């Protein structure tokens, strides 16, 4: 192993601006659970003053969520994220992971394990049992997370659908009138978008959790992108992105998965689209992870789905009269530095009332497998966010966030608190708006001969399977 490089921590002057931005510090009040305290520990590790298997060191470094909320508030530009990653790789090389963490990571390393596991989970979810068993205890919270992974039903109230249908009819009338009044005028938007589609081909990254528990978000991603002029393809041979392994310090496992994805996604496309903030952050970092020109070229093409939609407007849909609180995933706002695009997507939905609550930029406590291996701390972090939802006036009808872990963690927390709030991905709202507004022309999600999704090599794409 090469000598660990902690130079990204050099600018730290221990000013403490990071403390109020750190979820674990806010939850415990312990300096060692803050970025500043952890930097002191990492420097001691670097100098050999503390062993890599020291119980206290491991406890405080493992407790870091990796949310990177400390970086944007740091006046000195400390690269905390890079430092904690170096430390975790050093710790991983010197100890065995706890059995639960090792087992979970082992599953995600093997598609032949996680795909059947999530298929069974999806069947269980379909019975409605997880929703009935959801609660505040450890088992109940886990059931709540599984229930929250399903498609949010009843997002659009009846009066909203009626308003959207009326708006669609009015838009159709305006389009017809415009066409009649101008000979040789441009064709309606759908024709223009179809002609533009060939100029922008995007490869959908399937992932693991998104491709199984959140296949409906893949469907919405494809539909909304195609409605905005993109051609969506789904290359075969993709696996888990490796983010969970990288966060645990298992660089070798992350690299192995990244190489498989690099080979699968190497086909010609203008972009690689990701609808999971955690996956997108790592894919954008494949160049650094694999240290190769090919990986860097792929990473440069990676975009969050909201980035691609925002580049095209996106085109407006039908009205949805809903109070929506946008909750920014840490790995979208901090790691990828994507702030405006999700709001632009939501702003394209007429009548949507968008709010940014005080907790919107704070971590929810999901952090990959963190909520599984450190449930008490994850719940303590989450509770601060759930309180902000409950205290909002009015309480939002919908929370929109763009990461599967966040969708499940926040959804379970809302169920445990007894709040009637739906949690959805932003593209689900845009997709619903397009349905209400008649953008899909009554054929949303359908292909000749069967279910939704473009097929590559006979595989269904983004469908409920």
Can you annotate each of these PLM segments?
Residues 1-4, 33-55, 215-216, 338-347:
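Short, charged low-complexity linear segments at domain edges
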């Amino acid at each position: 192993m090469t000598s660990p490089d902690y130079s990204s921590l050099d600018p730290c002057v221990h000013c403490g601006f990071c403390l109020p931005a750190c979820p674990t510090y806010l939850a415990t009040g312990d300096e060692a659970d803050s970025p500043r305290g952890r930097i002191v520990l990492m420097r001691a590790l670097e100098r050999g003053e503390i062993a890599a298997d020291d119980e206290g060191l491991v406890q405080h470094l493992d407790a870091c969520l990796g949310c990177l909320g400390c970086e944007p508030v740091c006046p000195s530009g400390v690269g905390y994220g890079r430092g904690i990653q170096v430390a975790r790789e050093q710790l991983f090389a010197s100890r065995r992971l706890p059995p639960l963490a090792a087992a979970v990571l082992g599953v995600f390393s093997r598609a032949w394990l996680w795909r059947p596991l999530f298929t069974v989970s999806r069947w269980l979810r379909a019975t409605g049992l997880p929703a009935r068993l959801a609660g505040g205890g450890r088992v109940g919270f886990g059931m709540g997370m599984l229930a929250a992974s399903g498609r949010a039903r009843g997002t659009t109230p009846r009066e909203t659908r009626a308003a959207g249908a009326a708006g669609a009819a009015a838009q159709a009338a305006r389009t017809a009138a415009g066409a009649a009044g101008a000979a040789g005028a441009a064709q309606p938007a759908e024709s223009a978008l179809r002609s533009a589609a060939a100029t922008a081909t995007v490869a959908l990254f399937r992932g693991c959790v998104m491709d199984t528990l959140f296949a409906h978000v893949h469907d919405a991603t494809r539909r909304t992108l195609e409605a905005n002029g993109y051609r969506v393809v789904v290359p075969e041979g993709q696996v888990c992105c490796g983010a969970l392994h990288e966060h645990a310090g298992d660089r070798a496992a992350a690299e192995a998965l990244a190489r498989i994805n690099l080979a699968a996604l190497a086909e010609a496309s203008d972009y690689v689209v990701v609808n999971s903030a955690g996956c997108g952050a790592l894919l954008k970092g494949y160049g650094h992870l694999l240290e190769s020109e090919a990986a860097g070229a792929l990473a440069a093409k990676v975009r969050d789905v909201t980035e691609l939609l925002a580049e095209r407007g996106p085109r407006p849909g039908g009205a949805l009269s809903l109070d929506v609180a946008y909750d920014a995933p840490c790995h979208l706002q901090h790691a990828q530095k994507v702030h405006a695009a999700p709001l632009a997507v939501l702003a394209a939905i007429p009548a949507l009332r968008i709010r940014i609550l005080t907790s919107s930029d704070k971590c929810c406590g999901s952090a990959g497998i963190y909520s599984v291996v450190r449930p008490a701390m994850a719940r303590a972090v989450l509770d601060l966010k759930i309180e902000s939802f409950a205290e909002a006036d009015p309480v939002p009808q919908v929370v929109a966030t763009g990461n599967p872990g966040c969708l499940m963690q926040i959804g379970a927390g809302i169920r445990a608190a007894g709040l009637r709030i739906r949690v959805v991905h932003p593209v689900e709202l845009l997709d619903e708006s397009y349905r209400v507004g008649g953008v899909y022309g009554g054929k949303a999600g359908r292909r000749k001969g069967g279910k939704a999704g473009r097929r590559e090599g006979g595989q269904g794409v983004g469908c409920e399977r």
